[in-house]
A protein has these predicted regions:
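Boundary/linker segments of alpha-helical solenoid repeat arrays
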Residues: 60-64, 97-108, 160-170, 223-244
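Short loop/turn and low-complexity linker motifs enriched in small/turn-promoting residues
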Residues: 244-449
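Bacterial Sec signal peptide processing site at the extreme N-terminus
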Residues: 23-41
Length: 449
């Protein structure tokens, strides 16, 4: 028989811990929402200062959240034009993600029986390969084209390995699952094998460097990637009548000429956010109903369906959707759902089995405390089962692009955002000085509409 006085002290500490843990995880969720608000309003410097202060105090972003913190800092500094700083944070995140994945595979499924919010955030697979895209852009801004191409190759490789990575993780969990969970760990194949964004960047960079053969190969890969990507995003169904007529079920022709020296990228919308979905799952072996909380991706619906590029009174062209990052994220995340669901069910089973001794405690010894323990056990199962809603909040949702040639000189370029009806929504302006000694002049805009 356990020492009741000791148990009373422990149950009090448990209740206090549950309260503190619940507050901490919700506080992080709230902070992530504030980051999204700042990104929407383009208050990047303010968000950077806020993140730096929160890391110093260790009240919100703890060591287990370091990957998330570095991803946010990398993206916000990129938006703010601090490209070297941005790459420092992205490199920190890249290294930590690789270490976290190795650790998760070696530990197996039982490393995740606690609440995910208590564990190190190891990043989503799509977050891992998109960080290389923004590292590549940072290097272009720093005029380090070779380094940019290295990051593009890393991105392409990691996308190519997605199915192998997820299947390997699922097999590891399935082999270590001994709780009679009856979970189907098999992940479905991902319909993401390539990246139009990565191939488009590579084709433009090789063309600018005069590497004709490499540019041709990347152009072929780009066309293949676009053919695979457009059915995934069902782009034509998202457009209004005026835009649909010119793009119905067609992959757009992209200018990848050898003389292009201006590359324009417009990032629109925002990343899909994770929301909690609570389920009640009946387990036949344990003959009980289990509470399972799942993080579900909720897509952000952008109002922007195209971008017109103007130089003075001249329309230089239309930037049409190059890659839907949030659709790619949704596809990758959907394939990973058996793993997410399986981990949640195993947590629920472990909590259920771990609190069964309470029901067998003789009430005549201390009926009040026995009842209190039962309540505490139920409270633990309910409160501790909170979905892990951590995700890269500042990541954009879509990428639009256009490339063309300008003679040396100073120009003001207008990015005119077009809505689904084909009407102008908003305009942003960028100044550029074309220097014939510089092979690529990259201009970016970001509008989270």
């Amino acid at each position: 028989m356990p020492d009741l006085s000791l148990l009373k002290r422990r149950i009090t500490l448990l209740c206090l811990f549950l309260f503190q843990f619940s507050c901490a995880s919700y506080l992080l969720d709230e902070t992530q929402e504030q980051i999204k608000d700042a990104v929407y309003d383009q208050r990047y410097s303010e968000a950077i200062i806020s993140l730096e202060e929160s890391k110093k105090k260790k009240e919100i972003y703890k060591e287990k959240d370091s990957i998330l913190w570095n991803l946010e800092m990398g993206m916000l500094n990129h938006y703010n034009g601090a490209y070297e700083k941005s790459n420092k944070y992205f490199s920190n995140a890249e290294f930590a993600i690789e270490q976290a994945f190795t650790k998760s595979v070696s530990q197996g499924v039982y490393a995740f029986l606690g609440n995910d919010n208590q564990l190190q955030y190891d990043g989503e697979p799509y977050e891992e390969f998109y960080l290389h895209a923004f590292k590549a852009l940072n290097y272009i801004h720093l005029n380090k084209i070779d380094a940019s191409l290295v990051e593009i190759r890393k991105m392409v490789y990691k996308i190519d390995q997605l199915n192998i990575q997820l299947r390997g993780l699922a097999d590891t969990y399935a082999s270590s699952d001994t709780l009679n969970s009856s979970i189907d760990w098999d992940t479905k194949d991902i319909n993401v094998q390539n990246s139009p964004f990565a191939r488009y960047l590579a084709a433009n960079l090789f063309a600018a460097l005069g590497n004709v053969d490499a540019a041709r190969i990347e152009r072929e890969q780009f066309n293949k990637a676009m053919t695979e990507h457009y059915p995934l995003i069902n782009f034509s169904s998202q457009l209004g009548t005026s835009l649909t007529q010119s793009n119905r079920n067609e992959t757009p022709e992209w200018s990848l000429g050898p003389n292009n020296n201006v590359l324009l990228l417009s990032f629109t919308g925002m990343a899909s956010e994770k929301i909690q979905q609570d389920l009640r799952v009946y387990n036949e072996y344990w003959e009980t109903e289990l509470k399972v909380s799942l993080p579900i991706l909720n897509p952000y619906r952008s109002e922007i369906m195209g971008v017109e590029i103007w130089v003075g009174d001249s329309l230089m062209g239309h930037s049409i959707l190059l890659e839907s990052m949030h659709k790619v994220a949704q596809e990758v995340y959907t394939s990973k759902m058996p793993i997410i669901y399986g981990r949640a069910v195993l947590r629920a089973i472990s909590k259920y089995s771990g609190t069964q001794w309470v029901e067998n405690m003789p009430e005549e010894k201390d009926p009040f405390f026995a009842h209190l323990l039962e309540i505490a056990g139920d409270l633990y199962k309910e409160v501790s089962e909170k979905a892990d809603l951590r995700s890269w909040s500042s990541l954009p949702g879509n990428i639009f692009s256009h490339a063309f040639q300008l003679d040396p000189g100073s120009y003001e370029i207008e990015f005119r955002y077009i809505n689904k009806l084909g009407l102008p929504l908003y305009s942003e302006f960028r100044e550029v000085q074309i220097d014939q000694r510089q092979s690529v002049h990259l201009l970016e805009t970001h509008l989270a509409y």
